[in-house]
Regions:
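Terminal, low-structured helical/coil segments at or just beyond the last alpha-helical repeat
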Residues: 27-34, 236-287
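Alpha-helical segment of the N-proximal tetratricopeptide repeat
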Residues: 39-78, 82-89, 119, 123, ...
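Helix-start (N-cap) detector for alpha-helical repeat units in TPR-like alpha-solenoids
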Residues: 42-43, 77-78, 111-112, 145-146, ...
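Canonical tetratricopeptide repeat
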Residues: 48, 82, 116, 150, ...
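Position-specific recognition of the canonical hydrophobic site in helix A of tetratricopeptide repeat
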Residues: 54, 81, 88, 115, ...
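Structural signature of tandem alpha-helical TPR/SEL1-like repeats
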Residues: 56-64, 89-102, 123-136, 157-170, ...
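Structural marker of alpha-solenoid helical repeat scaffolds
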Residues: 72, 106, 140, 174, ...
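TPR/TPR-like (Sel1-like) alpha-helical repeat modules
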Residues: 203-212, 216-246, 270-272
C-alpha cells in the first residue's frame, strides 16, 4: 500500500510540476517574428494605404505611412515613388528628389521616376532639368502622350511656338481626343497671330470638352470679329470656372502675352461687368 501510495504521490507531483510548467509558460509573452516575405507584403499594403490617403487629400497622414513603408522595405522602387508623391504634395521637393533617386538606383527603367522628377523641376521653374527628365522618361515609354504634352508646354513657356506645336501634334496623334493639347496648340497659334487657326482649334477642343479655357480662348479670338458671340462665350466660361477672371491664373495655364491682352480688353466690356463681379465673389467665398 505504501509502495502504491508512493507511486501515486510521484505521479501526482509530476502532474503538478507539469501543470505548473504550463501555467508558467502561459505567463511568458509570445512574440510573432514575421518573415522577410511577410514584412515585404505588409510594406506594400501600407504603401497602398498611403497612396489612398494621398488620393483623398490627407497629405500629412499619407506622408507618415509612406515613410513607414520604405522603412520596412527599402528595396521596392514603387514605395519610394509613393513617398515622393506624398513629399511633393507636402511641398517637400528636395526630399522628393532624393526619394526618386533611390527609386532610380533600384530600377532605372521606370519612366514614372523621370516624369515625377520633371513635375518637381517644373514647380521649381527649372525648365532645363524638366526637359531632360521628360526626355529620359520618353526614351523608356515613347508614346506617353501626357509627357509629350508636357514637353510642348515647356516650349510654350519658352515662347518656342514651333516646337510647342510640334509636340502638341505628337500628343494628339497618339490620343486624338486630347482636348488639352488641342487647346494649347490654339494658344501657341494665337501668339503667332494665326487667329483663324486658333479659332478652329478652340472650337475643336470645345466639341470634345466644354471647358472654361477653350471657351474663353475662343471668346478672345472672336472679340473683334463677333463681339456678341464673344460675350456669350466669356459668360459661359466664367460660370464654369470663375478663376479665369484672374490674369495670374490664366498665366499659370500658360496663356501668352497676346491672348492675355485680348482677354483683358474683352473682360472690360460693360456687358461682362456683373459676370466679373460674380466670378470674383465666388473666388473669395472659396478661399
Amino acid at each position: 500500500m505504501k509502495k502504491h501510495f508512493t507511486k501515486l504521490l510521484c505521479i501526482s507531483l509530476l502532474f503538478n510540476f507539469l501543470l505548473k510548467g504550463d501555467q508558467l509558460n502561459a505567463l511568458v509573452p509570445y512574440y510573432y517574428l514575421p518573415t522577410i516575405k511577410n514584412l515585404e507584403k505588409e510594406s506594400l499594403s501600407i504603401g497602398r494605404n498611403a497612396y489612398q490617403l494621398l488620393y483623398f487629400g490627407q497629405i500629412k497622414e499619407s506622408l507618415n505611412l509612406a515613410k513607414l513603408a520604405v522603412k520596412i522595405n527599402k528595396l521596392d522602387e514603387k514605395l519610394w515613388l509613393i513617398l515622393s508623391e506624398s513629399q511633393i504634395a507636402n511641398n517637400l521637393y528636395e526630399e522628393a528628389l532624393i526619394s526618386l533617386k533611390k527609386a532610380e538606383n533600384i530600377n532605372p527603367n521606370l519612366s514614372e521616376i523621370y516624369f515625377s522628377k520633371s513635375s518637381i523641376f517644373l514647380k521649381q521653374l527649372n525648365l532645363k532639368e524638366a526637359k531632360i527628365a521628360l526626355k529620359s522618361g520618353l526614351r523608356i515609354t515613347p508614346k506617353n502622350h501626357k509627357a509629350i504634352f508636357q514637353l510642348g508646354n515647356i516650349f510654350l513657356m519658352e515662347k518656342n511656338y514651333l516646337s510647342a506645336i510640334k509636340f502638341f501634334d505628337k500628343a494628339i496623334k497618339i490620343k486624338p481626343e486630347f482636348w488639352q493639347a488641342i487647346n494649347n496648340k490654339g494658344l501657341a497659334y494665337f501668339e503667332q497671330d494665326k487667329i483663324n487657326k486658333s479659332i478652329e482649334l478652340f472650337e475643336k477642343a470645345i466639341s470634345l470638352e466644354e471647358n472654361a479655357e477653350p471657351l474663353l480662348g475662343l471668346a478672345s479670338c472672336l472679340r473683334l470679329q463677333d463681339i456678341n458671340s464673344a460675350i456669350l462665350l466669356a459668360k459661359k466660361a466664367l460660370i464654369k470656372n470663375p478663376n479665369y477672371v484672374e490674369y495670374n491664373y490664366r498665366k499659370e495655364q500658360l496663356w501668352g502675352e497676346k491672348i492675355q491682352i485680348s482677354t483683358e480688353k474683352l473682360l472690360k466690356n460693360d456687358q461682362l461687368k456683373q459676370d466679373i463681379k460674380n466670378a470674383k465673389l465666388k473666388i473669395n467665398q472659396s478661399s
